[in-house]
Design a protein with these regions (language model features):
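Intrinsically disordered, low-complexity regulatory segments enriched in Ser/Thr/Pro
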Residues: 41-98
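Sequence-pattern detector for short linear motifs
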Residues: 50, 64, 68, 103, ...
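Charged, low-complexity eukaryotic segments
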Residues: 79-124
Length: 139
């Protein structure tokens, strides 16, 4: 399965089950990787690829790999990371939605405040490269 196909399937699962989720994505120019931020990053981020990542300094909670068959989880750079193979896209979508709902329920208004803060940052001149190059999914 290609990374683009895996991305389309994942996005369809996420938007079908959670229509209000905000999705930004970026397809790398230098590799076959696609990067997604959910709710401006407030609901974490995903790297979809067919290869091990280079040490680019970015950290993604979720990773979807088209070249792997087994899932794993580990702590790396103080972040609990979870990798799913492309055969488990629906499980990944369910995990993301469950964790997003948990954050929203626990944080309440502060989750929305964080989302708005991140949106304002994205729109600012100080925003990082991802936000300058990414595309927001239109529904």
């Amino acid at each position: 399965m290609l990374t683009e196909e895996a991305t389309d399937i994942l996005i369809n699962h996420l938007t079908d089950k959670c229509p209000d989720i905000i999705i930004h994505y970026y397809h790398s120019y230098t590799s076959n990787s696609i990067y997604i931020k959910l709710d401006y990053g407030a609901a974490n981020s995903i790297r979809i690829s067919d290869h091990d990542k280079s040490d680019n300094g970015y950290n993604y909670k979720y990773e979807l790999r088209t070249d792997k068959t087994l899932s794993w989880h580990r702590f790396e750079n103080d972040i609990y990371k979870i990798m799913y193979p492309a055969t488990q896209i629906e499980q990944l979508a369910n995990k993301i939605i469950k964790e997003r709902e948990k954050k929203m329920n626990e944080k309440g208004q502060s989750y929305l405040n964080e989302l708005n803060k991140r949106k304002n940052y994205m729109d600012s001149e100080k925003s990082k490269k991802f936000y300058k190059l990414c595309t927001e999914l239109e529904r």
